Amino acid sequence: MSKLGVFLTICLLLFPLTALQLDGDQPADKPAQRKLKILPKRKHWTRFTCCYEEECPPSCKLCC
């Protein structure tokens, strides 16, 4: 192996690319906050979908 290859291997072992931190303002760092902004507030929930303020079927559960 050439000297350059050995040098690059040592550098990658000492400073792996995964050790680099993301900026604090990137959305990947804050998935919970991003999720809260996407989901609207809902009052009633069914098993898989939500009921809104209109008439709820009996399968809805009150979540307040």
Curated annotation (Swiss-Prot):
A Gene Ontology term for the protein's cellular component: extracellular region
Source superkingdom: Eukaryota
Range of residues in the leader sequence: 1-19
Keyword annotations: Disulfide bond, Secreted, Signal, Toxin
Pfam families, A to Z: Conotoxin
UniProt propeptide residues: 20-49
GO MF entry, a single one: ion channel inhibitor activity
Signal is among the record's keywords: yes
Positions of disulphide bridges: C50-C64, C51-C60, C56-C63
Family matches, as InterPro entries: Conotoxin
Chief location: secreted
Subcellular location: Secreted
Expression across tissues: Expressed by the venom duct.
Annotated domain remarks: The cysteine framework is III (CC-C-C-CC).
Similarity comment: family membership: Belongs to the conotoxin M superfamily.
The protein, known as: Conotoxin reg3.16
Protein species of origin: Conus regius (Crown cone)
